[in-house]
């Protein structure tokens, strides 16, 4: 069977390109054949002559099938280690995992001594249940001022599932946590160890796009969109396929690790070389990219009164930041704020009043709606809200 042989130091980049073309066979495994080379199984649709951006050689070798699904992870776990151990798993280990691209993220906690064998059995059982998972990461919570996940490699799938001390012998390139998300046919590149991303908001992004299309039709022109907490750009990625939806765009994030991904994820920037950005930079006629504190950026009078749509996705602090962001919106035409917030469930009944209070002198011209999206822990809720402000 045809495989693409590539150097391990270019493996992740080439894998992403191959997947972008839908040329990787899902029935067989990517595996290592030499210390510095891996092979990627190819579908029958792959042409004999590959595009110039794909580095490697086509080779003919026997494929290694992906394992068949052996049942639920609990069934596999119980078979290997005993039914009683399932009930003994602590809260973080028994909590559901999350899949981001070809990566599984498993909530866990650090052990003072060596990790118990049953933890590796748990990871192995889940990877057997999900044969397309390449890498599993332990999730120890969040860290740092950018609140990115504190992640550690738990296992990698090569010709077999590699765990524990054996991971030290694996080339770093094969342990890369960079991955590609597919949302509604769109591709979003990211590294969950470096940047924040929530796949749970995909439906929110679809809803946002639909409503902004209606808003565009109402005001009869492309929308000027300001996303001050853009991350790697998932909200914006959903907008670009719709011709005439977006006009000027300001995409900002405080985390510098997000900026290179904006150049890979936003279609108008993909043909550009990545630019180091310190502050704010006009990178195309319509797009500004910024790497700075959102409140500092919002205080720039050059940005005031310019934007039709404001995204506010800083759930733990959205309501505290919002009063400082209102001046960014246009006053001569309708404008929209699309935001998300995490707040105590007991405060949901007063959320509309709080938002009206934040709007101050523009509150009489505003319409507010919100929906509870999910529970966040025992006492809090994630809320998505819309504010429509009529012209003054």
Named regions from a protein language model:
Residues 1-392:
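SAM-dependent transferase fold signal centered on methyltransferase-like domains
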């Amino acid at each position: 069977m045809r495989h693409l042989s590539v150097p391990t130091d270019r493996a992740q980049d080439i894998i992403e390109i191959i997947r972008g073309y839908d040329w990787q066979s899902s029935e067989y495994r990517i595996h290592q054949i030499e210390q510095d080379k891996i092979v990627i199984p190819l579908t029958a649709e792959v042409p004999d002559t590959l595009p110039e951006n794909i580095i490697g050689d086509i080779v003919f070798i026997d494929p290694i099938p992906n394992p068949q699904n052996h049942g639920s992870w609990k069934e596999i776990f119980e078979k290997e280690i005993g039914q009683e151990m399932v009930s003994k798993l602590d809260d973080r280990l028994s909590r559901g995992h999350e899949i981001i691209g070809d990566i599984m993220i498993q909530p866990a906690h650090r052990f003072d001594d060596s990790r118990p064998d049953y933890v590796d059995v748990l990871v192995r059982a889940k990877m057997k249940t999900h044969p397309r998972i390449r890498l599993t990461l332990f999730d120890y919570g969040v860290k740092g001022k950018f609140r990115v996940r504190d992640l550690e490699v738990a296992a990698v799938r090569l010709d077999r599932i590699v765990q524990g001390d054996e991971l030290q012998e694996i080339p770093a390139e094969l342990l890369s946590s960079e991955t590609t998300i597919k949302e509604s046919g769109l591709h979003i590149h990211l590294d969950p160890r470096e940047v924040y991303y929530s796949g749970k908001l995909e439906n929110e992004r679809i809803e946002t796009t639909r409503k902004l299309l209606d808003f565009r039709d109402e005001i009869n022109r492309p929308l000027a969109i300001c996303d001050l907490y853009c991350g790697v750009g998932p909200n914006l990625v959903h907008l670009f396929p719709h011709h005439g939806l977006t006009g000027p765009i300001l995409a900002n994030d405080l985390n510098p690790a997000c900026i290179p991904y904006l150049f890979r994820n936003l279609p108008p920037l993909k043909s550009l070389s990545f630019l180091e950005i310190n502050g704010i930079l006009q990178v195309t006629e319509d797009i500004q990219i910024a790497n700075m504190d959102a409140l500092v950026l919002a205080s720039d009078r050059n940005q005031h009164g310019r934007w039709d749509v404001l995204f506010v996705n800083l759930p733990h602090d959205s309501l505290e930041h919002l009063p400082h962001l209102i001046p960014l919106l246009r006053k001569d035409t309708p404008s929209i704020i699309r935001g998300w917030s995490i707040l105590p469930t007991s405060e949901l009944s007063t959320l509309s009043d709080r938002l009206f209070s934040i709007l101050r002198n523009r509150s009489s011209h505003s319409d507010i709606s919100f929906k509870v999206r999910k529970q966040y822990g025992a006492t809090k809720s994630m809320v998505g809200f819309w504010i429509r402000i009529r012209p003054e």
